[in-house]
Design a protein with these regions (language model features):
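Proline/Glycine/Serine-rich low-complexity intrinsically disordered segments
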Residues: 1-125
Length: 125
């Protein structure tokens, strides 16, 4: 696990006493996994995909297990930063996202880029 992350907080609360190794960044985490010094890692799926799994050194590794996304630790999702007072733009963005989600197009587009669902579920679905 990366030190001082929400994943460390989750482990401390949910799996107290678990034998974990803490890292000061993601690169050493991926190196130890690749070289067999750890059996698994837990990190942000987007980061894992972009920095490791989609690269040559990430070949042979994959997402496993259930999605860990308790709101208490990980919030309600990602967001888009806007300047205060951009209410019209916020409304347009929310409307567009709602349309894409309801039609299934967001998931279709995301599947072209990421090997995991953007919404709750098991990896690889």
């Amino acid at each position: 696990l990366e030190r001082a992350t929400t994943y460390q907080s989750w482990f401390d609360d949910i799996l107290p006493g678990a034998d974990i190794v803490l890292y000061d960044g993601s690169e050493p985490l991926y190196l130890d996994l690749q070289n067999g010094r750890v059996d698994l890692i837990m990190t942000n799926p987007m980061k894992a995909h972009l920095k490791f799994l989609s690269k040559e050194n990430g070949a042979g590794f994959e997402f496993k297990g259930p999605v860990v996304d308790e709101e208490k630790y990980f919030g309600i999702g990602v967001g888009i930063g806007l300047r205060q007072g951009e209410d019209e733009l916020k409304g347009r963005l929310n409307g567009a996202l709602k349309t894409l989600i309801n039609s299934g197009e967001l998931e279709t587009y995301a599947r072209k880029i990421f090997p995991f669902k953007l919404h709750k579920g098991e990896w690889g679905q």
